[in-house]
Amino acid sequence: MEQFVLELAAPPAPTFASFVIGGNGPMLQALRHLADGELPHRAAYLWGGAGVGRTHLLHAAVAAAATAQRTACYIDAPVLESSTQLGADLIALDNAERLSAAGEQAIFEWFNRPGQRADSMLVAADRSPASLAARDDVRSRLASGIVFEVLPLSDDEKFAAMQAYASARSLPPLNEIFRYLLVHAGRDMGTLMALIEMLDRYTLSQKRPPTLPLVRQLLQQLRIANPLHGTDPV
């Protein structure tokens, strides 16, 4: 069990294909075009609460841009200090609500670079551009492209997504286990899908059917491995 817990710490790289869409179809289509360099807007801004997949989408955009032969980089806003860090074809800037004054200036300079530019920026934050505690001229520039709220999945949508994911892995019906996971294992889809994959691999290796006691054991091991996360396994 411990080995599988360690493996969960390195989940597969996020992609657009692995993002559970829910009500976010138009947003996902726009992000695909942004990553390919085909969006008429230079910038896109995503905002939403914890666990909706903002960071997943930024990493997925970086991967898609690389596939399209574009340079791309992911930057966590607190480490942004200069516009010289913003030299890739696609910049994926996370946690914009945590921009420093130097980071705000870097964003301002990026938007005001002269000439026609083919580079683009994807920004994510936990609040809308208007709600950022940033300079007015920075907020207005971040909102100048397309802005999407990343809509959370309903529990029914999460349940259906888990069923589809399990079915694709030829797992038996696990409705009781899925309901348990929704209550006890955090509500972001990355965590839930990783737990299902982990459960599948473990039961195959042990030649045991997936059961609630096994799931409880798995979650307990995760809490031991990640004590700072409290009831959230990852």
Language-model features: locations:
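Conserved nucleotide-sensing/catalytic segment adjacent to the nucleotide-binding pocket
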Residues: S83-A125
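Walker A/P-loop nucleotide-binding motif
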Residues: L39-L57
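Conserved C-terminal helix/linker of AAA+ ATPases
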Residues: T203-Q221
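Dynamic helix-loop-helix/coil hinge segments at AAA+ ATPase domain boundaries and subdomain interfaces
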Residues: L6-L28
